[in-house]
Amino acid sequence: MKALQEIYNLRKFNVNDLQSVMQINRSCLPENYTDFFFIDLYRRFPEAFIVAEENDQVVGYTMCRIEVGLSGLGLSGLVKKGHVVSVAVMPQHRRRGIGEALVTKAMEAMKLYNAKQCYLEVRISNDEAIGLYKKLGFEVTRTNHAYYADGEGAHVMTRKL
């Protein structure tokens, strides 16, 4: 099997990717965002908005933002932290390491913004994603019940950068 980088190209998002990313978001996730939301994150944190493409077609993405707040890992005071807002990979491209590569690249980008830790929310029923995030060093730091619009809860998963 060919190496991931030989099949898929990971690169920074650009505005020409917007429609493809929005389509992936709508196809893969129940949480959908407006075009303004995507563009706003891109403009504020361009290094942390990554797409995966195969043959010049976007097949996955992750977008993040940088926040200042209380540590989810017991550190005292306020810390700069990355927030993985959304990760999605088209179903026919899953289980090939794309999600792992996207999140890893996003974490590298968060360091460019001097983030010391990062976190994300994941549906408590999404065992596959939870397993991936644990593999990447995230740990469940709390659970928010009825977090999503449909009433499902979310695990907040956090890790140091």
Model-derived regions: residue spans:
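Conserved SAM-binding loop
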Residues: 10, 95, 121-122
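Acetyl-CoA-dependent GNAT
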Residues: 2-4, 8, 12-92, 103-113, ...
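Short beta-strand "wing" residues that participate in macromolecule-binding interfaces
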Residues: 64, 140-141
